[in-house]
């Protein structure tokens, strides 16, 4: 079993950053393990569990993150309500998962825009609007027709990569 997950964050300005993540996985032998690379922390716009699976996989995520709304305060009779900063990001993801016996699977990817609201130091509320792309060869991925449509909207609660 070989697995690697490399991440780098480069500051572009005082409030913006470029985030990149590279992931690779290989498992061989009589009973190789499988890895899933779909979902919000992998290939955005593709299913989270059981569809983009393989004993060999690689993935690249890239994102440019920047603030959209830095301060929002709403007044009420009970006092002001301060909201945290709203950030946006342009993203691009690409990857492939291959089972040992099936090497003809497509290279999958997605691109789009993401909006996020930090909920404390570790949690984030995120909305992704994007487009899927591939070479059209979905054989072996078990994706239904709606999961092959180009456009997607996805809501996520969790953490950033």
Residue ranges of model-derived segments:
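C-terminal beta-signal and terminal closure region of outer-membrane beta-barrel proteins
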Residues: 102-161
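C-terminal outer-membrane beta-barrel translocator/porin domains of Gram-negative envelope proteins
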Residues: 1-90, 98-100, 138-148, 155-161
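Short basic (Lys/Arg) and small-residue
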Residues: 93
